[in-house]
Amino acid sequence: MTDFEKIHSFESLYNAYRKARQGKRWKGAAAKFEVNLLEALNLLSAQIRTKRYTMSPYNTFEVYEPKRRVVMSNSYKDKVVQHSLCDNVLEPILTRSFIRDNYASQVGKGTHYGLDRLQEFMRRFYRKNGIDGWILKGDISKYFYSIRHDVLKTLIREKITDPDVLWLIDLIIDSTEGNVGIPIGNQTSQLFALLYLDGLDHFVKEKLGIKYYGRYMDDFFLIHHDKAYLQECRKQIEAFVQARGLSLNAKTNIFPLKHGVDFLGFHTYLTESGAVIRKVRRRSKNNMKRKLKKLAALHAAGRIDAKTVEQSYQSWRGHAEKGNSYHLIQRTDQYYNRLMKSKEAAQCQKH
């Protein structure tokens, strides 16, 4: 079976449909798709096989946490196709060259894995060099919106040669206006974005010789004992990303290890004794309190149930538990309980 056949086979599309329907916000769309499921999947398979498949218009909306972003969400049928493409071709082929410390959107990795690796690197550095070290914290400005279609297609063609698969990939890449930018909401965009800076990962590790390096999508760090060398690394990284149409965010800077670094929602720093401390960032705390207030108000108005509020809070709580956050969690638990009790009391008074 060719890679293209793996994508459009009925079995692959059925498995992709089952994965796509797991997201809560897709329940309504999944129900419509299921009305004539066999017919819908057979039609989709035939459309891809004969290259008559076209993508539906995007649903565009804005999200504001952790920062303002424009999200372009695709239709349910397009989501099914992208699941099949990613699971059967893109993920197994593109990730082969990824370094261990490329943390995002991969099975067995993620934010907590990235945080653990940063902590491990700091400990290793301390054992060899003590506390006198530096960390270059980098960030790509408007990453997804700046990815050039022509560069991305070239990088993909270094890995994938099947012309039929490339037809489908190009269709997805070119589904937005212009020749720059990929939709944040697409599943394929996650793998495309990981691939786009795979070359940077190898450049930093192999050419610049940085032992302690990690990247989570557009966020990366380098640890070294020599500040001057990290300044040189920054110049070379800047030149590398500029060649791909990208630029470093103004926040990119070099900090003493003992002052720590903001990475993946935590502030992580090294103490004089060699202990690595991980604290929830102030912005994350404030965002959670604001979100809880909004959710509690929606609950009091009868628009959502208490379970929805609790699930959101428990998700943040699980994240906070990955750091040195015992007292913070105790305080936030008390805040959450006060908030929910006051809203429940208000509801009782209404009735």
Show which residues each predicted segment covers:
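Conserved two-metal-ion catalytic palm core of "right-hand" nucleic acid polymerases
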Residues: M1-L152, I160
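Conserved polymerase palm-domain catalytic core
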Residues: A40, Q47, D116-M217, F221-E238, ...
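Short, conserved aromatic-histidine micro-motifs
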Residues: R52-S56, I210-M217, N287-G302
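Right-hand nucleic-acid polymerase module
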Residues: N74-S75, K79, H83, S175, ...
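PAPS/PAP-binding and catalytic site of the sulfotransferase fold
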Residues: L85, I237, V241
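Surface-exposed helix-capping loop/turn segments at secondary-structure junctions
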Residues: T95-R96, E206-Y212, G245-L248
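Beta-rich nucleic-acid/ligand-interaction surfaces
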Residues: A104-Y113, F221-H224, F255-G260
